[in-house]
């Protein structure tokens, strides 16, 4: 017959590129936070440590006692700044002396230090099948 007795609904993820774009937008406006403990009550609160991006300044946000804004549930937050991967450290060898492809990634890999170019000729056997 033409009647429906059961209706099935399901959730589906957005396309991968759309999810990546959304995550990148949130990353670009991520909020650095400070964790403060109320010694008397033993309660912990989280407060932003930097100003809100221009596009979010008109929106109302809850405040913690010292006047700092609390991040929303959808905000990406971080506690420490990322290390510079340009300089060598105990966590990273840095990017000095790395090979890059001119016009593609040298500006980012070389971290503004500039780079030397080299032209080379390479001969390889052709791997031909006769």
Swiss-Prot record:
Signal peptide: none annotated. GO terms for cellular component: extracellular space. The keyword Hydrolase does not apply. Its main location: secreted. It is found in: Secreted, Extracellular space, Extracellular matrix. A lipid is attached at residue 1 (O-palmitoleoyl serine). Palmitoleoylation is required for efficient binding to frizzled receptors. Depalmitoleoylation leads to Wnt signaling pathway inhibition. GO terms for molecular function: cytokine activity; frizzled binding. It comes from the Eukaryota. Coiled coil: none annotated. Glycans are attached at residue 97. InterPro entries: Wnt. Residues 41-69 are annotated as: Disordered. This is Protein Wnt-9. It comes from Eptatretus stoutii.
């Amino acid at each position: 017959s033409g009647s429906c007795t059961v209706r099935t609904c399901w959730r589906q993820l957005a396309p991968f590129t759309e999810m990546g774009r959304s995550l990148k937008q949130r990353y670009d406006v991520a909020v650095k936070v400070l964790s403060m403990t109320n010694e008397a009550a033993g309660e912990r609160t989280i407060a932003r440590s930097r100003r809100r991006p221009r596009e979010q300044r008109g929106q109302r946000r809850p405040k913690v006692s010292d006047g700092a804004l609390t991040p929303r549930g959808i905000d990406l937050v971080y506690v420490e700044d990322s290390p510079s991967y340009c300089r060598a450290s105990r966590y990273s060898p840095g990017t000095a002396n790395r090979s890059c492809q001119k016009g593609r990634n040298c500006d980012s890999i070389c971290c503004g230090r500039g780079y030397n170019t080299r032209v080379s000729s390479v001969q390889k056997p052709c791997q031909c099948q006769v």
